[in-house]
Regions:
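Active-site-adjacent structural elements that line small-molecule/cofactor binding pockets in enzymes
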Residues: 1-166
Length: 166
């Protein structure tokens, strides 16, 4: 917080919020709060984690791609200031609306590893965070992102691609 208060250009991002561990409405509230702290500089990183990590929390790990698609759809509407009622397979918010929506769109980044999630990220995300892959797989991962982007009528240039380095 102190760093953000003293700067104007540094962005802040959630590393990766596990979408299995909190509903999209709560994540939207947290993202809106980040945007209040650093107006126009918040970014939201989301991911599905792994079966093993979800098991630690006692949370099932099912339908990661369709769950992510639904989550992001709800999140975008809530962050746009809409009153959201959604009848999804996984989430069903009823009349939820932020008391104060962010004035600018908060970019959503998806952590992705497997081809289907990489394609989904290319289709619906503002950015993609690659992790846990050897350098030789980066080119193929980017090709999968490009496939998803093309399906949505987007260009790879529309998507910010980052990579965790370990």
């Amino acid at each position: 917080g102190a760093l953000l208060a003293r700067t104007q250009r540094i962005h802040i991002s959630t590393g990766i919020v596990s979408l299995y561990l909190r509903p999209p409405t709560l994540t939207a509230m947290q993202a809106a709060t980040l945007d209040l702290i650093a107006p126009g500089r918040a970014r939201l990183g989301l991911g599905v984690s792994t079966q093993n990590i979800n098991a630690f929390h006692g949370v099932p790990w099912d339908h990661p791609v369709s769950r992510t698609r639904e989550y992001v759809a709800i999140l975008r509407r809530v962050l746009a200031g809409e009153r959201v009622t959604y009848d999804g397979k996984f989430y069903r918010p009823r009349g939820f609306q932020l008391s104060m929506a962010p004035p600018k769109r908060i970019p959503i980044y998806l952590a992705a590893v497997n081809p289907k999630m990489l394609q989904l990220a290319g289709e619906i995300a503002d950015g993609v965070l690659l992790a846990w892959l050897p350098a030789r797989q980066v080119r193929q991962s980017i090709a999968e992102i490009a496939k998803g982007a093309a399906r949505a009528g987007r260009s790879l240039a529309d998507i910010d691609i980052g990579c965790y380095i370990h």
